[in-house]
């Protein structure tokens, strides 16, 4: 999602370089957000560019360049925050480039849940192992048992979206891992850029293809949710490029994102 948000900013930058009217850029910004309505990081970054542009295509172009640079730096800085704060061993699941970078910098033993059905965790495990990290891969179903009997310094996961309530939308299995960590008295941290904090508390469930779970001939229903919602009270903190966000910090970031989104109301009023 971070990569898609950067691509959206590139589109906005390139269009701003060749058009001279604000209304066209408003339409571009609307289309970019409509194409990924559940992607908070994309909306937040586009809104930040538009909110400070004062209806100027030149300003949109320049601000988009600045925002791209900041976005490219944000994940690396968040990973550094996590590496500085945590101590191993670490448990995680699925794939996150920011989690990977944090774990490479931390260089502690890692247990990775494979993240069925597509097993994105294998990609993370292999990337860490190829860099010399001591890695154990296990099934999602085994994670609770592993956490109950082995010593871990923390659970570290990424995030698709963080709601203003502090609840975390991430790969299915994150909620179960967090519950298992709570039972084992292991703190759970999320590492992500602060732009993944959503301006509103809407959760958009997404289902994957049924054939990822079952491709037989029996007449049965398949539940294949791509993301789950982990309650914020199971999360010790959110580690970002600006340090650790507690619940109050998350609320303040969400409020700023809501403020940045108000450019659209002003644009609509002006156009009428």
PLM region spans:
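Conserved phosphate- and dinucleotide-binding cores of soluble alpha/beta proteins
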Residues: 115-272
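Glycine/charged-rich beta-loop-alpha catalytic/anionic-binding loops adjacent to active sites
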Residues: 27, 62-63, 109, 155-163
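Gly/Ser/Thr-rich loops at beta-strand to alpha-helix junctions
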Residues: 2, 93-99, 117
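Nucleotide/pyrophosphate-binding catalytic subdomain
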Residues: 61-65, 69, 76, 122-125, ...
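Long amphipathic alpha-helical segments
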Residues: 1-69
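Histidine-anchored nucleotide/phosphate-binding helix
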Residues: 96-107, 178
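Residues that mark the start of a beta-strand
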Residues: 88-89, 109
